[in-house]
Amino acid sequence: MEKELEEYKSQLALVQISLQKTPQNEELQLLENDLKELISLTENLLQESVENDKNTFQNSQNGVAGFNTSKPVHIDFTPGNLVMARWVSGDYLFYPSRITAVSGFGANKKYTVQFLDYPDIETVSLKHIKAMPEEKRQEIEGNKEILKKSTTIRSTPVREPTKAISVASMSTSPSNYASRASSPDMKSSAAVTANVSPIQNVAQHVSTLPKISPIPPSNPPPVPSVSYSQKQQKQLKPKAALEASQNSWKQFAARGVKTGRVGKRKKIGESSIFKSTEDFPGRTNPKNFGNVARSGHREKHIYNYREDEDS
């Protein structure tokens, strides 16, 4: 905006200089009026923007001061406190639990919590823990049975539940597990398996099952044995086929071809133009076509100029 204002002012100065030379020019007069209006509008906009910036700066200062005055509240949790802990390995929601142990120092503290609705234990950081509402805390403290579940550890052997637990039901949330444990079918087994997770129940149930070893067949099929002669025959089969085809062609060529009903058989290649003679020096080439090789040979002609002079 400031650069535009400077440009408008410089243009107005040029127009005023030209008007001094030609004061009766109407176009320059109109241009001068337009530039003056533009300059006034831009100045008003600049003033408004400066005022807005001041207000925002003051508001931000007030906000920062107010923020600094309110100090963040840090709650130091200790073992035995009732809190709302997040089920990190499950549905990532908060459930009522009790802190059993604290490890680490400062921001790296780790809290070992035991959920009240189900007996699994997890180790989480401070960001996964929040204070429990006062009403809910008083309600849980008044109910002694819930507190006993999280503090007592039974050494009696675990009894199998009356109904089989499916694998899909083990991956449900703690609230679903609590509702299932409160059903009439599971009440008798919940008191015994209060501190044992469903995964441990299934593992113990599988360990009690009898181990079944595979029964070998009474009459196993005989292993096919390949002798050396069979291998040799397989390797010689292609060679034998090739030799048989060669022999059949040789027999056909030796037998010859009949020219007529009573005619003599002619061997294949007997009347061929490419057939070489039976003599030892016989050879085949495009010039003699099977004639006997001659002893003479063609020499290169050399021109003799003296023969021309004598003539």
UniProtKB/Swiss-Prot annotation:
Record's keyword terms, sorted: mRNA processing, mRNA splicing, Nucleus, Phosphoprotein, Spliceosome
Major localization class: nucleus
Basic and acidic residues: compositionally biased ranges: 301-311
Family annotation (InterPro entries): Crb2_Tudor, Tudor
Domain Tudor: 76-139
Spans annotated as Disordered: 154-183, 276-311
Highest taxon in the source lineage: Eukaryota
SUPFAM superfamilies, per database record: Tudor/PWWP/MBT
Record's comment describing the protein's domains: The Tudor domain mediates association with dimethylarginines, which are common in snRNP proteins.
Quaternary assembly: Associates with spliceosomes.
Function noted in UniProt: Involved in spliceosome assembly.
PANTHER family for the chain: ZINC FINGER CCCH-TYPE WITH G PATCH DOMAIN-CONTAINING PROTEIN
Annotated protein name in UniProt: Splicing factor spf30
Lineage of origin: Eukaryota, Fungi, Dikarya, Ascomycota, Taphrinomycotina
